[in-house]
UniProtKB/Swiss-Prot annotation:
SMART domains: S_TKc
Keywords, comma-separated and alphabetical: ATP-binding, Cell cycle, Cell division, Cytoplasm, Kinase, Nucleotide-binding, Nucleus, Phosphoprotein, Serine/threonine-protein kinase, Transferase
Species whose genome carries this gene: Arabidopsis thaliana (Mouse-ear cress)
Official protein name in the record: Cyclin-dependent kinase D-2
Entries under PROSITE patterns matching the protein: PROTEIN_KINASE_ATP, PROTEIN_KINASE_DOM, PROTEIN_KINASE_ST
Family assignment from sequence similarity: Belongs to the protein kinase superfamily. CMGC Ser/Thr protein kinase family. CDC2/CDKX subfamily.
Molecular function GO labels: ATP binding; cyclin-dependent protein serine/threonine kinase activity; protein kinase activity; protein serine kinase activity; protein serine/threonine kinase activity; RNA polymerase II CTD heptapeptide repeat kinase activity
Organism phylogeny: Eukaryota, Viridiplantae, Streptophyta, Embryophyta, Tracheophyta
A cellular component annotation (GO) from this entry: cytoplasm
Catalysed transformations (reactions): L-seryl-[protein] + ATP = O-phospho-L-seryl-[protein] + ADP + H(+); L-threonyl-[protein] + ATP = O-phospho-L-threonyl-[protein] + ADP + H(+); [DNA-directed RNA polymerase] + ATP = phospho-[DNA-directed RNA polymerase] + ADP + H(+)
EC class name: transferase
Gene encoding the protein: CDKD-2
Modification sites for Phosphotyrosine: 24
Residues in Protein kinase domain copies: 13-293
UniProt region (Disordered), positions on chain: 293-348
Pfam families, A to Z: Pkinase
Length: 348
C-alpha cells in the first residue's frame, strides 16, 4: 500500500460509467491511466464477516491469481479503499446471455460450436487445477471485442479433490443446477459444472433458457419432463441423497423432439452431459474430445463471431410474453441473478 499522501491505487483507474449494480457492490467501466487500457472494476463493500462478503471476495482473488488461461477472465489488480475492496479485471464488451437474447444475431451451428469449445476449454483448465466453478451460466461467460469467451465470477468457486470434503448444495442459479444438488448432495465433483455447461449448450441451440424452474421442486420437474424420471438402474445412489423425494414416473421423450435442428453429434454430446448419475456423466475433457467438435462444420473463428453492439440492445421482453415451456411466463434470467454469497459458517 502507498504511504499517506502518495497516490493511492484507486487513483490509477479513471471511472467512466457504471456497468451493473448488485447487493454487495457495483461494477464500473474505467480507464487504466498507467496503460491507457479500458478495465472493469468490481467495487465490493466490506461488510462484517458474518455476511460472508470478505471471505467470498478473498477466495475469488486467491483463485484468479492462480488461474491463467485464454478463456478465464484476467484479474489485473486488487486493493482495499474507503471501506470497499476493488477488483480490477480486463474489460469484456458483453456476455453470452446478451448474444443468445439478441435476435439481430444469427447463431450458426459453427458459432454455437465455437462458444461451447471456448466454454469447455476454460472449464477443463479449471478442473485440471482442481477448481469447481459452481456458478456457470451465460451471463458469467464474458465476451471481448475479439470474440474470445472467458469464464468469470469465481466467487462461488472451490477447490475439490478430497473424497470426504463436503460442500453446500446451494450453488449455481437454479436453472443450471444439477439434479444431485437439487436432491441435497453435499459431496460432489466436476459433474455439477458439466451439467450447467449442458444447460448453456441447450440454451445456445434453443435461444431461450432450457429448464427455467421457478423453485427447486419445479426445477426437478422440468428436468424429469425433459429427460424422464430417473430410476435406480440409471442412478442407484439418488435414493440416499439428503433431500431425495420420489416423483411420479415420466418417460423420456426423444431429444430430437426438443432440439429438432441439432445435429446427431450435438444431440449425442448433450445426452452425455445430462446423464443423471454424476459418476457416469461425461467429463469436460471427454466432451472436448467428442466427435461433435471435429465434425463439420468447424467452429467459427472467434474474431468472426457476431456480438451485440452494446449489452441490452435488441433484447426480448422479460415477462410479458409466453415462452415455449407451456404457459410459464417468459423469463430470461434466473431468479436472483446476482450470485449467492455464502457465509463463513457451515458448508462451503
Amino acid at each position: 500500500m502507498s504511504k499517506s499522501g502518495d497516490n493511492q491505487p484507486v487513483d490509477r483507474y479513471l471511472r467512466r460509467q457504471i456497468l451493473g449494480e448488485g447487493t454487495y457492490g457495483v461494477v464500473y467501466k474505467a480507464t487504466d491511466t498507467k496503460t491507457g487500457k479500458t478495465v472493469a472494476v468490481k467495487k465490493i463493500r466490506l461488510g462484517n464477516q458474518k455476511e460472508g462478503v470478505n471471505f467470498t471476495a478473498l477466495r475469488e482473488i486467491k483463485l484468479l491469481k492462480e488461474l491463467n488461461h485464454p478463456h478465464i477472465v484476467e484479474l489485473i489488480d486488487a486493493f482495499p479503499h474507503d471501506g470497499s475492496l476493488h477488483l480490477v479485471f480486463e474489460y469484456m464488451q458483453t456476455d453470452l446471455e446478451a448474444v443468445i437474447r439478441d435476435r439481430n444475431i444469427f447463431l450458426s451451428p459453427g458459432d454455437i460450436k465455437s462458444y461451447m469449445l471456448m466454454t469447455l476449454k476454460g472449464l477443463a483448465y479449471c478442473h485440471k487445477k482442481w477448481v469447481l466453478h459452481r456458478d456457470m451460466k451465460p451471463n458469467n461467460l464474458l465476451i471481448g471485442e475479439n470474440g474470445l469467451l472467458k469464464l468469470a465470477d469465481f466467487g462461488l468457486a472451490r477447490l475439490f479433490g478430497s473424497p470426504n470434503r463436503r460442500f453446500t448444495h446451494q450453488v449455481f442459479a437454479t436453472w443450471y443446477r444439477a439434479p444431485e444438488l437439487l436432491f441435497g448432495s453435499r459431496q460432489y465433483g466436476a459433474g455439477v459444472d458439466v451439467w450447467a455447461a449442458g444447460c448453456i449448450f441447450a440454451e445456445l441451440l434453443l435461444r431461450r433458457p432450457f429448464l427455467p424452474g421457478s423453485t427447486e421442486i419445479d426445477q426437478l420437474g422440468k428436468i424429469f419432463q425433459a429427460f424422464g424420471t430417473p430410476v435406480p438402474s440409471q442412478w442407484s445412489d439418488m435414493i440416499y441423497l439428503p433431500d431425495y423425494m420420489e416423483f411420479s414416473y415420466t418417460p423420456a421423450p426423444p431429444l430430437r423432439t426438443i432440439f429438432p435442428m441439432a445435429s446427431d453429434d450435438a444431440l449425442d454430446l448433450l445426452a452425455k452431459m445430462f446423464i443423471y448419475d454424476p459418476r457416469q456423466r461425461i467429463t469436460i475433457q471427454q466432451a472436448l474430445d467428442h466427435r461433435y467438435f471435429s465434425s463439420s462444420p468447424s467452429p467459427t473463428e472467434p474474431g468472426k463471431l457476431q456480438i451485440p453492439a452494446s449489452k441490452g440492445d435488441a433484447l426480448e421482453p422479460k415477462a410479458s410474453e409466453q415462452n415455449q415451456h407451456g404457459n410459464s411466463p417468459a423469463v430470461l434470467s434466473p431468479p436472483g441473478k446476482m450470485r449467492r454469497v455464502m457465509g463463513p459458517e457451515g458448508f462451503t
